[in-house]
Amino acid sequence: MVDNRILRELGPDNREGRGKRSQVLAIDTDFWRIVSIDLSNPKLAKGALADLSGRIVDRTELPADNGCSVDDVISLCKQLIASTPLPILGIGIAVTGIVEPDGVVRKSVHLEWNELPLKAEVENATGVPTLVGNDTNAALVAERFFGDCSPNSMLISIGRGVGAALCLNDVIIEGSSSTAGEIAHVVVDPNGPTCECGKRGCLESLVSDDRL
């Protein structure tokens, strides 16, 4: 990992003890960059460029009044890639809805995407390894790494949509069908307002930003 510039050597470990002195290692923040795309707002794609410690070094946004398309996502990725002379280690994309482990967005009500191979589309267009995941799961991972979150935690996100994420023993629980946190369209009031999904009285239709 040192040869690949993921880690760097700080020097020998000077603690007392027998044997050969080991090297103290740290994350190398001067070489690789990571592209991050947030699609939690279907009409505003947000992008960031970060080093390997997670420190954001650049941000940009792409308005999409008619809803974000795959072309919008690819355009934003390419814009961020072009903004730095440093190599890109990977692209991470957070999407509302149900995302399969292979990066296929099975269903996103707000983005109006169904069975979309987003990972493959972005990788083919950029040549950069890409990870696609649910936005609420991604938020919980961020809270775990950079916040004050325990290894056993739950996060509930309320915005344009409603979602939940669960972490047990430092593992995000997605379920066999990748729907463990999909609470938005659980019907809580059969006589409630019509939801974007077409059903009546979904949790999202009662407590999302648009309804509160």
Regions found by a protein language model. Give the residues of each.
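Short beta-strand-to-turn element immediately C-terminal to the catalytic PLP-Schiff-base lysine
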Residues: 50, 142-143, 165-169, 173-175, ...
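Glycine-rich phosphate-binding loop and adjoining helix at the ATP-binding site
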Residues: 56-152
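Gly/Thr-rich phosphate-binding beta-strand-loop-beta motif of the actin/hexokinase/Hsp70
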Residues: 21-59, 155-168
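N-terminal helix-turn-helix
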Residues: 1-10
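A short, polar/charged loop-to-alpha-helix boundary motif
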Residues: 67-73, 179-191, 195
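Conserved phosphate-binding catalytic cores of ATP/NTP-utilizing and phosphoryl-transfer enzymes
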Residues: 9-12, 16-34, 133-153
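Active-site core segments that coordinate phosphate-bearing ligands/cofactors
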Residues: 185-212
